[in-house]
């Protein structure tokens, strides 16, 4: 195991913070990066911010967190640049190279670990993870398979069911099914009963999600979800409290660590569920209660099942696992998020803080886990 990850120039491991990306969650990724860059111990790590524009271009970004923070005026966005950043192997080391037209490429030095703070497709779904695996670069978080499964709400449920976890009623709808026989899809949804939640299969931050109370609203909700992904998951509404649990990979062969469960309380008003605005935009629209007001045995069960879900998809580093806690005391798993947000309003760091692990220490532990794990098959 490699133990010395410091660079000869600074004596500190170099951490490339990767954010932005091509998905509809671009702005959320920028806000997450602002949170991490503001809290990371710069006496311990040398931070290199790399933004990915919506075009897919990698650029050397500003380390000024105010440029990436959420404001009421505008959502943050990585702008394209004439200078492109690439990750290449030079002399046996992973080097960041800056290229621009009619100029000699500039070497920025080696990278010890990448922190991919990307949400949604082309970042959280195994694509970036595959690129980093191919380049034999260490990185924070889940690998290719776990990231892909954790991004696809359909196959995620298939894996959960195979692990013995309770999953609510749902139907998966492909582009071909909706395009060739929409009426058959409507009949399948009708059997679920209303209300239902129509969701893009591969999107996060509640992008494109609609609550539908009757058949009359189904087609419009499907059209909205298909703007984000042509594959959909339509779930039966479940009466229950929304309970979340943060999971952190154990060191070495230790079991996953779990936080105290938290409960999401959404303010009554325009929000029928925990949507994008409640998560990121509107102050006071949602609040976390941690630990959740539950019997001790239910709390223990949430933590146990969260660890089962983490292992079921083969997650590494971190994940947030969401459940419904029904009036009958049943725990129904909703989803796993293999790269949960780190914004000031994000639940993952809040739950760990309530469990005794501060934000900066959490970031430090995630980087430690990435630096000390093997590359390649593991």
Swiss-Prot record:
UniProt binding sites for Mg(2+) 1: 322, 335
Chain residues that bind Mg(2+) 2: 335, 337
Biological or metabolic pathway of the protein: Cell wall biogenesis; peptidoglycan biosynthesis
Residues noted as binding ATP in the record, renumbered to the chain: 189-244
Domain ATP-grasp, chain residue ranges per copy: 157-368
Cofactor(s) annotated in UniProt: Mg(2+); Mn(2+)
The keyword Protein transport is annotated on this UniProt entry: no
Role, per record: Cell wall formation.
Protein name: D-alanine--D-alanine ligase
